[in-house]
């Protein structure tokens, strides 16, 4: 009964460790996730940051180091994955189940959290999560975290090979989103 409830997507709680959806609905994928991320503070309100976060993908791409995102997409396409699939249902609005390029929206709490499931071919299952926290005084913290549930030794090797790039990309990406939110609010 618990697995059926989890598969239906109607689970009321949120957790990352062992979450069936975050493991690509596979039992053979690691229960405990590896994770990497970055954060930045924007001198603007949560709504301005949320608008940039929900605009990710499609024509906007990923705001930072798009050449590396494109390289990963091409690598995925070469092994038969959806890596070069780009686009989204709507340029600024997201809802559960939407596809954003090769990601799927699996969690959304307006102005607080956006959770995307990784859709490329890889030895494991991944999730990219954006969390927004209002700090008061017109400041907002954006935190981006990638969770990776490896499948076997290849999944671990894949994760550890990409950790340096992930740290670089996620720190830069959160800073780029924060600066963009500030510019959009003031402009």
Briefly describe each language-model feature range.
Residues 108-116:
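Short, hydrophobic/aromatic-rich segments at coil-to-beta transitions
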Residues 118-168, 177:
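Beta-strand/loop substructures that line and gate deep hydrophobic ligand-binding cavities in soluble
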Residues 103-104, 130:
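Small-residue-enriched segments and motifs
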Residues 1-6:
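Active-site-lining helix/loop region of Rossmann-like oxidoreductase modules
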Residues 178-187:
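Short, highly charged C-terminal tails/helix-capping segments
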Residues 80-99:
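Secreted/surface-exposed cysteine- and glycine-rich disulfide frameworks
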Residues 8-83, 186-187:
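Hydrophobic ligand-binding cavity/cleft-lining segments
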